[in-house]
From Swiss-Prot:
It comes from the Bacteria. GO terms for cellular component: cytosol; glycine cleavage complex. Pfam families: GCV_H (PF01597). The glycine cleavage system is composed of four proteins: P, T, L and H. This is Glycine cleavage system H protein. It comes from Acidobacterium capsulatum (strain ATCC 51196 / DSM 11244 / BCRC 80197 / JCM 7670 / NBRC 15755 / NCIMB 13165 / 161). Keywords: Lipoyl. The glycine cleavage system catalyzes the degradation of glycine. The H protein shuttles the methylamine group of glycine from the P protein to the T protein. GO terms for biological process: glycine decarboxylation via glycine cleavage system. The modification N6-lipoyllysine is found at residue 63.
């Protein structure tokens, strides 16, 4: 699996693309592949305050329900409304089917996240391949 080099990643398999003080958040291709067919996405609401490492929503698949963990702290500025009617878009392209956009409280928080190379190594270590 290829992971976009300009994204940062969590060990819980979320990604964030940073653009100035705004971050776009989704789940990784590894996560969607592990979950299987996604049937529902619970997103936060615009205006919600999100704290790094805390649950901000969930993804439900035919196999399981998985919590989503915030890669950074901030205020939700947008949610991907398309996922309400078509959550399977995450299965089609996990790295463009974003879940929320967030105005970062502290851009430095993203520096502690994994880059693409480190995330790929983490996945290999976790899966044993």
């Amino acid at each position: 699996m290829a992971y976009p080099a300009n994204y940062r990643y969590t060990r819980e398999h979320e990604w964030i693309e940073i653009d100035g003080k705004t971050g776009t958040v989704g789940i990784t291709d590894y996560a969607q592949n592990s979950l299987g067919d996604i049937v529902f996405v619970e997103s936060p609401k615009v205006g919600d305050k999100i704290e790094k490492g805390k649950v901000f929503g969930s993804v439900e698949s035919v196999k399981a329900v998985s919590d989503l963990y915030a890669p950074v702290s901030g205020t939700v500025t947008a949610v991907n409304e398309e996922l309400a009617n078509a959550p399977e878009k995450i299965n089609t392209d996990a790295h463009t089917a974003w879940i929320m956009k967030i105005e970062l409280s502290d851009a430095a928080e993203a520096e502690s996240l994994l880059d693409a190379t480190a995330y790929e190594a983490f996945v290999k270590e976790e899966t044993g391949h």
